[in-house]
Structures are given as C-alpha cells and as structure tokens.
C-alpha cells in the first residue's frame, strides 16, 4: 500500500481551522519563480492591486524554507497562528520559500480563486520587477480596499 504524503500533517492541521473546508497545495511556476528568489517575503506580505486583496486577502502567510514533514507542519502552524493574531482572520494563502503555495478556504471556489489570483499576482510581480520593481499598496490602502462593501459583495459572488 502507498504511504501518505509527508505533507499530510499540515493538510490535516489546516483543515482543522475554523471555516476551512478545502486545502490545496501546488508548485505554481510563476509563484515559485518568486519563492525561489530573495523577494519571496515581499511577495507574501505586500499587495499590488485590488483583485489580489479580494481573492488572496490582505497578506499571505510566509514560511521560510523548511524540510517537508513534521517540522514543516509545525512551522506552518506557528506562522499561521501569528497571521491570525495579527490580522484577525484566517489566511487564504501560505507561501513556502523554495517550495510552493497552499491555498485554503470555505469553498473549492475560494481555494481556486486564491490560487489563480496568486499566479496572476506573481506574473505582475515578475513583470514589475523587470521595470524597476513592484509598487506596493500602503497598509492604509489595503485596509480601505478590504473593508469596502462592494469588495465584500464580490467575495460573496465568488463564493469566498
């Protein structure tokens, strides 16, 4: 019989979070281009455009490189708990340095929307880097956009 993935522990933990029913883990090419660069944490904790905030939330959890297995699950847990304390919400994305992306949500649509938007944001980030670097939103702009009623309506329409 096949053995379960060494990453099963972090999947189980994430599925135990309030409101989380779906967890997806991929190694999206453009996202990994950034995660394998010195700009990985910048990409995780900053936002560049409104759709990124709507689909990927105000920031993503950033996990420094950790070997897969129990240690990675423990690091994901501690970084996720710190995110929840800081932002008072569950994350929609977890970006793992030199590894990949985890998206999570209450519906499969929210998981897919976050994954696709993270890949779009990665393409924008890489393109902006070629033109002198990305221009990030301020925390005030992020908070304002995240709190707009029309953006909340869009999230409901996207089943987020």
Where are these regions (language model features)?
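Glycine-rich flexible loops
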Residues: 1-160
């Amino acid at each position: 019989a096949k053995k379960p993935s060494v990453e099963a522990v972090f999947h189980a933990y994430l599925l135990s979070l309030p409101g989380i029913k779906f967890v997806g883990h991929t190694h999206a090419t453009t996202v990994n281009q950034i995660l394998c660069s010195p700009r990985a944490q910048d990409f995780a904790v900053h936002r560049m455009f409104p759709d990124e905030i709507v689909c990927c939330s105000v920031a993503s959890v950033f996990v420094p490189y950790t070997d897969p297995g129990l240690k990675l699950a423990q690091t994901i847990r501690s970084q996720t708990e710190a995110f929840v304390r800081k932002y008072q919400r569950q994350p929609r994305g977890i970006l793992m340095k030199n590894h990949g992306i985890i998206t999570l949500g209450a519906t499969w649509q929210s998981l897919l929307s976050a994954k696709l938007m993270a890949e779009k944001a990665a393409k924008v980030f890489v393109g902006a880097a070629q033109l002198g670097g990305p221009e990030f939103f301020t925390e005030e702009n992020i908070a304002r956009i995240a709190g707009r009623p029309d953006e909340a309506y869009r999230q409901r329409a996207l089943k987020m």
